[in-house]
Amino acid sequence: MASECGDTAHVSEAPGRLTIVGLGGSLRAASHSRAALEVALAGAEEAGAETRLLDLRELALPMFDPEHESPAGAAAELVETCYAADGMLWSSPLYQGTVSGAFKNSLDWLHILGSREPPYLHDRS
């Protein structure tokens, strides 16, 4: 199944193999949205992709502060892993009709990718 938070390397073991990163946006221990994401990642793996799960409960991201855009620790892991992915699967519970605060915070951290070339998650599926 998908590897979890840890190493940020993108290079696939097999040339031509896609790397799919799943971003799980629930802080709940028994998360239904994370369970659905794990099923989707398993399907991607069965189709030949290398997969990685970024579980926001385990990642424990600090709040994004736009005045301090140099990520370290968990934030750097999130940013580098997402940028290196060939494709992403996102899953979040809905609270008050929108994504969880933890999920939104993770997307805020990806703002840092705007200064890269190509910017953000451009050309990712």
Descriptions of predicted regions:
Residues 35-38, 66-69, 103-107:
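Short, glycine/charged-enriched secondary-structure capping and boundary segments
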Residues 12-49:
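N-terminal beta1-alpha1 ligand-phosphate binding loop
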Residues 53-73:
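N-terminal beta-loop-helix "entrance" segment that forms/cooperates
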